[in-house]
Amino acid sequence: MIKSLSWNPIIQVMGIFFIQPFVLGVWLALIPEVQSGLNLDASQLALALMGAPAGMLTTLPFAGKVANTLGIRKIFYIGFPVYFFTITLTGLADGLDILFLVLFLAGVCGSLLTVSLNVHAGRVEKHTRRVIMNRCHGFWSLGIMTGSLLGSALHSESTVLMILIMCASALFPVAWLLCLGLPSYENITSVEVSPVFVIPQFPTILICICVFAFGITIIEGAMADWASVYVKEMLGPEAQGTGYGFGLFAAFMALGRFFGDNLKIKLGTKLVARVFVISAILGLIILVTADDLWLALVGFALTGMGVSVGFPLAVTSAASIDDKREASYVAFLSLIALIGFLVGPPIIGFLANVTNLKTGFIMLFPGLLLSLFMSSKLISIKTGGNVK
């Protein structure tokens, strides 16, 4: 009976987007506990946290081909339990090297799930002729925000390992049920996969879209890794609720994504991108100048809102260039986006070790200015055909 379970494809894909980052959100809220438990300074923590993006960066060149070879269903069925398990293993890490290795493995699984999720969402958009990409990523933000808030609430109740085990155990059956009856759109178009590393084979418009996403994901990676540490620095080492800064960032990122699809239809892709990037710039200005927590929280909110629609707009644009190469284009976009995740956090960490996090955050401005400039290159989806 369960095997015949059927979902509305739009509700189903949004549910999967919500579940996928939930345990990650719990882990992000627990980073200050891991840092103090392993006695890591800011630069050591930055090095350890490079594990996840390094794993994703290693896998993404092949993720598009794997998605087409194995199919989205198999990747979901295998990827979710392995992904949840590897994140849970971070609770067993007893040093920088083990933490890096476990996060690397989580990054490998996460890359396959990320590409598969975005490719599937793009296919659902084309099949249903509904604009849903921003809302899908809104549910992703809602999932990571909920996980972060749960992690903040539970961090004093148990160990990092037990909290992660409880959350992963509760979410695994939910993820499995959501993936049952996943519609197959594999044959809607004949997908051609090209080698990701051969940049000249990709159109110039895709490169511009990737540059736009790069500036956005630097911010996302920086906030994911350092927002909780920023709040802890501001409130003191014994402070409670250090995950609320990232929780607010993720909440407003989710809010922006839920309204993003309608705004894109009414105002156009390029204008929406510009306005939101400017919001992120204003939020970052507040973060590097704030002297109290409440003002900093306003900065987190504006920054989260500002970067909210960036990656979804980039995914839709990349998937709309050529139906036959959507998996390759989305994989390449994800690769460049993950480089943003990889570059931002360690630079901030090393600067913070010498000065403070506010100085590190200043290094995020050039990426946002680059995204603002490249926002004019974004394109809108045209269902059932190519966008020239």
Q: Predicted segment positions?
A:
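Structural signature of the two symmetry-related core transmembrane helices
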Residues: 74-88, 271-286
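Helix-to-loop junctions at the C-terminal end of transmembrane segments
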Residues: 59-71, 155, 256-269, 352
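Interfacial helix-cap and linker-helix signal at transmembrane-aqueous boundaries
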Residues: 34-35, 66-67, 153-158, 231-232, ...
